[in-house]
Amino acid sequence: MTTNEPHIADVAASISQPAMIEAEHIAPLTHIEAGIMARVELERFLGRVKTLSAADWDQPTDCTLWNVRQVLAHQAGAYAGFASWSQFMRQWSQLFKKRQPGQFSVDLVNQLQVADRANASPAELIAELSEVGPKAIATRQRLPAALRALRFPFGPPLGFVRFDYLTDLIYTRDTWSHRLDICRATGREMVLTSDHDGRMLALVMRDLAGKLHLELKDSAIAFKLTGTAGGNWRVGPGENPVASIQMDALDFSRLSSGRLNPDEARDQSLVVINGDAQMANYILANTSVPY
């Protein structure tokens, strides 16, 4: 006698083990979706900085060169760069200037944004971001498809990429990661929802899968990220993962953005590895994508 009903053990397993998604099959970000995510993230970022007290602004952040006020200054400057043509040209002309050893071209852009606002108060920075933020998003949404598809050399860590990889994805990812920086620095809660923040982390995982595909050859690694923004992903062409890496989703973001290194993650017990430890640690050492 046969039945189409699932075995009770299979049902229990499906409840205790959430479905694992192949990271390379995560849907790419569309231009329309990019606009929606950018507006949500700007609203959440502004909502958080508007709650900060006077004592919060000088707190150091995971971006070791910047305190909380300087992170806000960077964000105000980044959005200002797409709110007016003159600001865009002034900021991005920095890409062609000589860099210091170990410095990325984009660091020069970021430095200018912060330096321009060195004397601005937090209230002035919030007011500026409230004004230029929506304008910048609207500008990016109006960019013609032909322009968005052009590939440009942005230098490390972006390299040679489509313009819309920057305008649709990286700018919003940057704001998201700096919201996390500010929440950690000030002890504030990071507002998270699976549809927005979970999608943000899924797109990080998609980038990571593209980067590691050749590294893994015929193998695969399972990433199990806990929390509201988390999920279970298989990275690599292999069908059965040889190891699993479990982390809180926000700690994974810090790792993949360079704010947390693998040794710190292990020393602070922020990562749990099962299976092939050598392979898992190799992948940890290469878990980085542009932010």
Residue ranges, per PLM feature:
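Short, helix-capping/interhelical loops that line the mouth of catalytic, cofactor-
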Residues: 2-33, 81-135, 139-141
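Glycine/small-residue-rich hydrophobic helix-like segments
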Residues: 212-255
